[in-house]
């Protein structure tokens, strides 16, 4: 009898971690709260941000803005916002002056509950406006010195972009998202169009890890179909 009981206990202790590991996580968003985002060269213009808290198993993990993009039935991406302390050194003993800032993008795994930051090449948190399709992100990237503009298509899981095409000099004003509109996607076939200004319209065909430019005749044939 003792041997039987020991066997049952051993099996229980062996199986228990497996059940604990497979317990599903609950991913949820909080209510929308409107906060002020100070922009411009002097940070004297206030824009509204509609912020939501991101919870994993009722625990606050991040703050987000905008709608999430469903990549798969398991993964989604969403943009991060955060608060930074704007206090000066001589004000360190005072109450922190929290200022909201817009950040990069997060990838959330519903099964593991893991939240990870996405590295998007040439992505500028102030000027770049990404457009998501499947596991691709298309946006206008900005060089590190802020002088050059690029058409960029990045794919989740890849360090290098599958497209990086120079678009000329950066010409955005002091407002966020002013470099160029979000690119437009279409499917069957998968294509993305960049229009950084009235004089430029570039369409690219996306096939896996490869991107090809679409000429005018191909675009006309696709429209006719």
Regions found by a protein language model. Give the residues of each.
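Beta-strand C-termini and the immediately following turn/loop, strongest in propeller blades
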Residues: 79-82, 96-99, 138-145, 193-199
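Surface-exposed loop/turn elements that mediate protein-protein interactions on large endomembrane-trafficking
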Residues: 27-61, 99-120, 150-169, 202-222
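Sec-dependent signal peptide recognition
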Residues: 2-10, 14
């Amino acid at each position: 009898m003792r041997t039987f009981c020991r066997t049952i206990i051993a099996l229980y202790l062996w199986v228990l971690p497996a059940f604990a590991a497979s317990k599903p996580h609950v991913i949820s968003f909080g209510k929308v709260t409107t906060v002020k985002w100070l922009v411009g060269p002097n940070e004297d213009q206030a824009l509204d941000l509609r912020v939501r808290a991101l919870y994993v198993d009722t625990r606050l993990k991040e703050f987000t803005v905008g709608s999430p993009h469903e990549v798969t039935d398991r993964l989604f991406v969403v943009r991060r916002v955060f608060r930074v302390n704007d206090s000066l050194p001589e004000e360190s003993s005072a109450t922190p002056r929290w200022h909201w800032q817009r950040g990069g993008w997060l990838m959330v795994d519903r099964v593991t509950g893991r939240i990870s930051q996405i590295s998007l090449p040439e992505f500028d948190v102030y000027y770049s406006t990404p457009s998501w399709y499947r596991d691709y992100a298309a946006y206008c990237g900005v060089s590190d010195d802020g002088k050059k503009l690029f058409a960029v298509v990045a794919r989740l899981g890849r360090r290098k972009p599958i497209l990086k095409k120079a678009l000329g000099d950066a010409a955005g004003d002091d407002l966020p998202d002013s470099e160029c509109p979000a690119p437009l996607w279409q499917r069957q076939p998968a294509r993305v169009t960049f229009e950084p200004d009235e004089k430029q319209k570039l369409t690219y065909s996306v096939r896996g890890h490869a991107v090809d430019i679409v000429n005018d005749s191909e675009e006309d044939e696709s429209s006719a179909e």
